């Protein structure tokens, strides 16, 4: 079974940005105030959590990864509360405490798991000299595998361009969750992680995935970025890089409880994985899995290694996901014993596009379980040429396994999956395109076992070749 690991043995991350304290008041609400048409909350519990850049650092620390935090706080109770929180999680707290400004604090009042009100206590740190932060960064940057600049628009990162240049000179990747529409500030960064609304505020409305890719690649070129990760809420996330195919990941969130701090979790896991030397695709997969966990929690939260491990192998525990051939045989046998109808299809799935997604959804509707057999990299080269595949086998299978319509993904090394289909013997064999049923590899084996063979149509205009042509045309 192909696995991603939630252990980051070689990672070390530095976080610099807008530090905040999140306070939560929890209580019961049973009546409306006689003074005004507002609920009366009887406070029954108070909780304090790290927010902003401090929450980013907490996310990294929760993964058992060494992390240091640089930022600005006040010499006040909130600042001392933050210091205590950070120290309790073994975070190196290098925040500068100022007597001229209070610590940025956000107070949320909740009842029955619903947020009723948020109160912000802040003056921000605009026009506060950040020379000390810059000097500290220059001294320490080479000791880290990644730098996160956590920008909430509160002023700590007024020297962000100089900070980026310090990291570039040291050869350390810089990741930024951007704020506002002035992306010129982030020129030369390694990776930006805007959400969809932030992305469209800069590039304009995008009517479809193709336009997201086109405008995203232009943004990368305009601001000399290495990569761009657009987080798209219920549509997952999209990784873009020059001269490489877009990497789309569907959301893994089962239930969205609270999105507070989800962006912090994404960039934390991304940076940690990159600092650990993981490929960008794997880093995004892990970040996506972590985000799916954290939005199921209340308030500013973190993800533990165990939670991340369970999330990235969430189907493994029930026999689903990416399986080796012998594991798939056992899973299919058990499913057949339960009376489930097994549907099977195959392909290269080099660059997953809407046509693929629609096709797989339609195939899944024809039965209870869907198996997708995927050509290995060498098999794709023999079929498509030396320039293919664009995405390697692990990346292609990871994306397919993330689709709700797909139950099992299995690789095969031959030019056709005929042998594999003969071993699995699905109840229904499905293929997309203009084939005649008798031309489909494995059809004879399925028919001989009393099964069915069906041809489904792809959406018009959707093809991997067309996607590649659009990418080449955008260069």
From Swiss-Prot:
Q: Known EC number(s)? A: 2.7.1.167, 2.7.7.70
Q: What domain of life? A: Bacteria
Quickly give the catalysed reaction. Answer: D-glycero-beta-D-manno-heptose 7-phosphate + ATP = D-glycero-beta-D-manno-heptose 1,7-bisphosphate + ADP + H(+); D-glycero-beta-D-manno-heptose 1-phosphate + ATP + H(+) = ADP-D-glycero-beta-D-manno-heptose + diphosphate
Signal peptide stretch: none
Chain residue ranges for the region called Cytidylyltransferase: 344-475
Subunit comment: Homodimer.
> What NCBIfam families would the database entry show?
cyt_tran_rel, PRK11316.1, rfaE_dom_I, rfaE_dom_II
A single GO CC term, please?
Answer: cytosol
Q: What class of enzyme is it?
A: transferase
Q: Which family does it belong to?
A: In the N-terminal section; belongs to the carbohydrate kinase PfkB family.
Gene Ontology MF: a single term = heptose 7-phosphate kinase activity
Pathway the protein contributes to: Nucleotide-sugar biosynthesis; ADP-L-glycero-beta-D-manno-heptose biosynthesis; ADP-L-glycero-beta-D-manno-heptose from D-glycero-beta-D-manno-heptose 7-phosphate: step 1/4; Nucleotide-sugar biosynthesis; ADP-L-glycero-beta-D-manno-heptose biosynthesis; ADP-L-glycero-beta-D-manno-heptose from D-glycero-beta-D-manno-heptose 7-phosphate: step 3/4; Bacterial outer membrane biogenesis; LPS core biosynthesis
Q: Which UniProt keywords apply?
A: ATP-binding, Carbohydrate metabolism, Kinase, Lipopolysaccharide biosynthesis, Multifunctional enzyme, Nucleotide-binding, Nucleotidyltransferase, Transferase
Start and end residues of each stretch annotated as Ribokinase: 1-318
Active site, UniProt feature? 264
Question: Which GO terms fall under biological process for this protein?
Answer: ADP-L-glycero-beta-D-manno-heptose biosynthetic process; lipopolysaccharide core region biosynthetic process
Task: Fetch the InterPro entries from UniProt.
Answer: Bifunc_HldE (IPR023030), Carboh/pur_kinase_PfkB_CS (IPR002173), Cyt_trans-like (IPR004821), PfkB_dom (IPR011611), RfaE_dom_I (IPR011913), RfaE_dom_II (IPR011914), Ribokinase-like (IPR029056), Rossmann-like_a/b/a_fold (IPR014729)
Q: Which species does the entry assign this protein to?
A: Actinobacillus pleuropneumoniae
Entry's PROSITE patterns?
Answer: PFKB_KINASES_1
Chain positions recorded as ATP binding sites: 195-198
Q: What does this protein do?
A: Catalyzes the ADP transfer from ATP to D-glycero-beta-D-manno-heptose 1-phosphate, yielding ADP-D-glycero-beta-D-manno-heptose.
Please state what the protein is called. Answer: Bifunctional protein HldE
């Amino acid at each position: 079974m192909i696995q991603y690991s939630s252990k980051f043995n070689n990672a070390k991350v530095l976080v610099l940005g807008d530090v905040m304290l999140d306070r939560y008041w929890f209580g019961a609400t049973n009546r409306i105030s006689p003074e005004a048409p507002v609920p009366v909350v009887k406070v029954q519990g108070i909780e304090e959590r790290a927010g902003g850049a401090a929450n980013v650092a907490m996310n990294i620390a929760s993964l058992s990864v060494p992390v240091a935090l640089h930022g600005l706080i006040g010499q006040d109770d909130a600042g001392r509360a933050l210091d205590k929180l950070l120290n309790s999680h073994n975070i190196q707290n290098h925040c500068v405490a100022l007597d001229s400004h209070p610590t940025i604090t956000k107070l949320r009042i909740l009842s029955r798991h619903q947020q009723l009100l948020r109160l912000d206590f802040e003056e921000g740190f605009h026009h506060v000299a950040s020379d000390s932060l810059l000097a500290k960064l220059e001294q320490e940057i080479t000791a880290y595998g990644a730098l996160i600049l956590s920008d909430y628009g509160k002023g700590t990162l007024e020297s962000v361009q100089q900070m980026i240049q310090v990291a570039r000179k040291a050869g350390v990747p810089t990741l930024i969750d951007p704020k506002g529409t002035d992306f010129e500030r982030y020129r030369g960064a390694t990776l930006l992680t805007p959400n969809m609304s932030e992305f469209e505020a800069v590039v304009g409305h995008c009517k479809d995935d193709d336009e997201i890719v086109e405008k995203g690649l232009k943004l990368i070129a305009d601001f000399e970025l290495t990569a761009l990760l657009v987080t798209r809420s219920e549509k997952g996330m999209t990784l873009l890089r020059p001269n490489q195919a877009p990497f789309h990941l569907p959301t893994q969130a089962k239930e969205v409880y609270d999105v507070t701090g989800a962006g912090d979790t994404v960039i934390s896991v991304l940076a940690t994985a990159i600092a650990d030397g993981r490929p960008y695709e794997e880093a995004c997969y892990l970040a996506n899995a972590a985000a799916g966990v954290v939005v199921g929690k209340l308030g500013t939260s973190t993800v533990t290694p165990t939670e991340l491990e369970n999330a990235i192998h969430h189907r493994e525990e029930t026999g689903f996901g990416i399986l080796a051939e012998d594991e798939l045989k056992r899973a299919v046998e058990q499913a057949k014993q339960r009376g489930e109808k097994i549907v099977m299809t195959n392909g290269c799935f080099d660059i997953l596009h809407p046509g693929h997604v629609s096709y797989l959804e339609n195939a899944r509707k024809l039965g209870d379980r869907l198996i997708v057999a995927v050509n290995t990299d060498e098999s794709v080269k023999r079929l498509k040429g030396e320039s293919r595949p664009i995405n390697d086998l692990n990346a292609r299978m990871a994306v397919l396994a993330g689709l709700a319509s797909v139950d099992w993904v299995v690789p095969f090394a031959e030019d056709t999956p005929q042998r594999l289909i003969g071993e699995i013997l699905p109840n229904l064999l499905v293929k997309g395109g203009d084939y005649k049923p008798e031309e489909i590899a494995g059809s004879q084996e399925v028919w001989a076992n009393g099964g069915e063979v069906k041809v489904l149509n792809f959406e018009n205009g959707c093809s991997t070749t067309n996607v590649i042509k659009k990418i080449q045309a955008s260069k």
